[in-house]
């Protein structure tokens, strides 16, 4: 249950989660603008997955602080960022044999008989 009331604008009712999503989107863009020049994206294998995890974490923290019952506030965010941005990238990198991070795969010639 959120502390924010249901907003009614011109006869349309908007749930509190909509405003939490808009606020978390604004904070996500500000945080992303700060992180881009810092060089943290050089350590991230897949920036789109990292951005998704970052937005989910910001939304989770906003919704926890707006009145939702969250016992372990920061732990799920850290786990989500680690698993999606780093661990999944390493597993995919291992599957492709180390050639998928922007490097060219050496040409493989097959002898057809």
Swiss-Prot record:
InterPro entries recorded: DUF1656 (IPR012451)
Protein's membrane topology: Multi-pass membrane protein
Subcellular location: Cell membrane
Pfam families per UniProt: DUF1656
Disulfide bonds: none
One GO CC term, this protein: plasma membrane
Key words, A-Z: Cell membrane, Membrane, Transmembrane, Transmembrane helix
Protein origin, superkingdom: Bacteria
Record field: transmembrane: 3-23, 43-63
Coiled coil region boundaries: none
Family of the protein in this entry: Belongs to the AaeX family.
Name under which the protein is recorded: Protein AaeX
Lineage, opening ranks: Bacteria, Pseudomonadati, Pseudomonadota, Gammaproteobacteria, Enterobacterales
């Amino acid at each position: 249950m959120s502390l924010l009331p249901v907003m009614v604008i011109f006869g349309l009712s908007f749930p509190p989660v909509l405003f939490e999503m808009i606020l978390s989107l604004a904070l996500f863009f500000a945080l992303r603008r700060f992180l881009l020049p810092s060089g943290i994206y050089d350590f991230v294998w897949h920036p789109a997955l990292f951005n998704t995890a970052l937005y989910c974490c910001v939304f989770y923290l906003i919704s926890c602080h707006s009145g939702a019952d969250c016992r372990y506030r920061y732990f799920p965010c850290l786990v989500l960022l680690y698993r999606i941005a780093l661990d999944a990238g390493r597993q995919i990198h291992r599957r492709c044999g180390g050639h998928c991070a922007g490097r060219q795969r050496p040409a493989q010639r097959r002898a057809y008989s």
